[in-house]
Structures are given as C-alpha cells and as structure tokens.
C-alpha cells in the first residue's frame, strides 16, 4: 500500500498500529492542566445509547474517578461536584474518589450526553468527556 499511495514527505504507512501522540495527547501535561484524562465504557450505557434513562442514571451516576492522592491535594471529597477544564472546554461532574485510578490520571465514562447552554457559558453539565 505504501508503494501505491501518494504520500507527503515524512508521511509513513506502518504495517502494524503505532502510537501517534495527538496535539493535546500524551506528553501534554502542564502546570495549568496537570492530569491526564482517559475515557472508559460505562456499565449502564453502550456508548451513548441508554444514556437518557433516569433509572439507569440513578443507579450508575456519571462520575469522574480520581485517585485519593490527587483528590486530597485538590481538597476534593467523594461526591463533590467539581469543574474540570481543558484547553478546549469545561464540564461539571460528580467526583468519585477511588484507588482504582493511578495518580496523575482521571477517568470519565464515555457516552454521557452533552448538556450545555451554547448561547451562554458553554459549560457542560452532563459530564461529557468529549467536551474536554
């Protein structure tokens, strides 16, 4: 394939998957944005399907998972409503303090519906990881 495609200088087609850092990807932790954010599949949804069912939301809330060490250094307690920002957006989400996440990383379930006033502050109240 790499012999038949017209590639720009420096472009490569690899025979197996190779990690490529995104423009806000791995290695972009800064003083302003000191934590990595990863998405994971939520137990009450299939991607965004079933994300609108109140009974499922009641038993499996949309929560940001954070390591106890990171939570303590930021005065975050389990159940707190917190603001999370990135260079491209902001969400508000409930915190779940758990040792199941490594320090320096937060985890947000994928599939939450975007709930923001796009004519106002544009802050997503639904905890949609794609906002970040």
Where does each model-flagged region fall?
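Long, low-complexity segments enriched in small/aliphatic residues
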Residues: 1-54
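Long, contiguous, secondary-structure-rich segments that constitute the structural scaffold
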Residues: 48-65, 69-132
């Amino acid at each position: 394939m790499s012999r038949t495609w017209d590639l720009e200088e420096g472009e490569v087609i690899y025979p197996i998957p190779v990690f490529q850092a995104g423009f806000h990807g791995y290695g972009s932790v800064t003083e302003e944005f000191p934590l990595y954010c990863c998405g994971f599949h939520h137990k009450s949804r299939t991607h965004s399907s079933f994300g609108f069912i109140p009974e499922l939301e009641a038993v499996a809330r949309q929560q940001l998972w954070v390591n106890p060490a990171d939570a303590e250094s930021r005065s975050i307690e389990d159940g707190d409503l917190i603001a999370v920002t990135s260079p491209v957006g902001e969400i508000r989400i409930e915190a779940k303090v758990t040792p199941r996440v490594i320090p320096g990383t937060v985890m947000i379930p994928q599939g939450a519906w975007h709930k923001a006033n796009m004519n106002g502050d544009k802050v997503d109240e639904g905890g949609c990881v794609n906002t970040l």
